[in-house]
């Protein structure tokens, strides 16, 4: 819901609430899978709350994200936040699954996050990506007539169409 690819459209708060209400009407039977892979890269506004954040720990949202966009493409660590009612079943089914990411990498990332380095890193990245995005937008605006170009979105390489 933070933005839809490739259009860059953001799901409005009212629609998010409607979606959560729809899932809540059938508890244990309807779940929303939220793949929030780069919501931390908003430049002009604060990040919007995730559906999982709006629903809470008992809500009907399975939240997925990754560190490959926010840190580096080579850091292939993703994570999932399950509703409490699904956690036991997941642990029972996958208790022997060791994952594909080594413990060293996981522990290094955990220390990076708990030490506050991840938050500082994101602030630097937002500044750098905003500057790059602004330079791209300026170059596009000088290269095309206003009626030929439509720009939308907040992502580092915003969506553009040429008429």
Where are these regions (language model features)?
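Inter-domain helical "communication" segments and dimerization helices
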Residues: 28-29, 114-117, 146
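Short, conserved active-site loop motifs that form the nucleotide-linked donor/cofactor pocket
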Residues: 30, 61, 148-149
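Conserved glycine-rich beta-strand-loop-beta hairpin in the small C-terminal domain of fold type I
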Residues: 110, 130-137, 148-163
